Design a protein with these regions (language model features):
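Signature of the catalytic double-stranded beta-helix
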Residues: 1-86
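Catalytic core of non-heme Fe(II) oxygenases with the double-stranded beta-helix
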Residues: 48-141, 177-180
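Catalytic core of Fe(II)/2-oxoglutarate
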Residues: 121-198
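Feature targets compositionally biased, intrinsically disordered low-complexity regions
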Residues: 13-14, 89, 113, 161, ...
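A structural signal for short, well-ordered beta-strand segments and their strand-loop junctions
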Residues: 33-37, 90-91, 102, 144-148, ...
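Short, flexible loop/turn elements at secondary-structure junctions
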Residues: 40, 56-60, 92-96, 149-151, ...
């Protein structure tokens, strides 16, 4: 699994799935600075491969003031973003646990100072879906999905047993200036009811 890798490093050190994903990218993406992340999860029904909840990827955050908790100190800066990131996502075995996007246009409410943006906006997106202002779209297996810093999406809980591969490249982000080319050997899952056992 790759974390914060550039294209060349990911291609040279990735397996067949990683190289297939990178080969399928649009040519203009391959020639720009980008950062690649991937994860492989062994999932069981009810497990989440990512923290669930409607959110955006890589919206610039303010520096965290000394002594302040990262959750409230480093909230996304939607008013004056330093950059506007773009991403391409792909899944293998998506049917086990698809990423969902909320498609459509909406205006989100301003959040009070100190409140958590995505905690509040998650509830708002759910209402917008219920009112058919936004529509849910489940990512399909082995497709590329291009989205940007304003595309609401969420991880979902697994509905069956199996392995799931997730890959994402990002550009127009400060992360391309901080590439670390890491290979990670484990990743976590999240449980809704951790004491129920398995």
């Amino acid at each position: 699994m790759h974390f914060n890798s550039d294209f060349k490093y990911a291609y040279e050190n990735g397996g067949e799935i990683t190289r297939s994903f990178l080969d399928a990218l649009p040519e203009d993406w391959k020639n720009e600075p980008l950062v690649f992340d991937s994860r492989v999860h062994m999932l069981m029904p009810g497990w989440y491969p990512a923290i669930p909840g409607w959110h955006h990827d890589d919206v610039p955050r303010a520096e965290i003031p000394t002594g302040q908790h990262f959750i409230t100190g480093g909230q996304p800066d939607y008013d004056n973003p330093r950059y506007k990131s773009e991403h391409i996502l792909g899944l293998v075995n998506a049917e086990i646990c698809p990423t969902e996007f909320a498609i459509g246009n909406c205006l989100m409410p301003k959040i009070k100072e100190g409140d958590l943006i995505y905690r509040e906006w998650h509830k708002e997106v759910e209402l917008l879906i219920e009112d058919n202002i936004l529509q849910k779209h489940e990512c399909e297996d082995r497709y590329l999905y291009h989205f940007d810093w304003q595309a609401f999406h969420s991880g979902t809980k697994a509905i069956s047993n199996g392995w799931r591969w997730f890959g994402r490249v990002s550009r127009n982000t400060e992360r391309v200036n901080k590439v670390t080319n890491e290979i990670r050997v484990n990743c976590q899952v999240y449980l809704e009811f951790p004491m129920e056992g398995w």
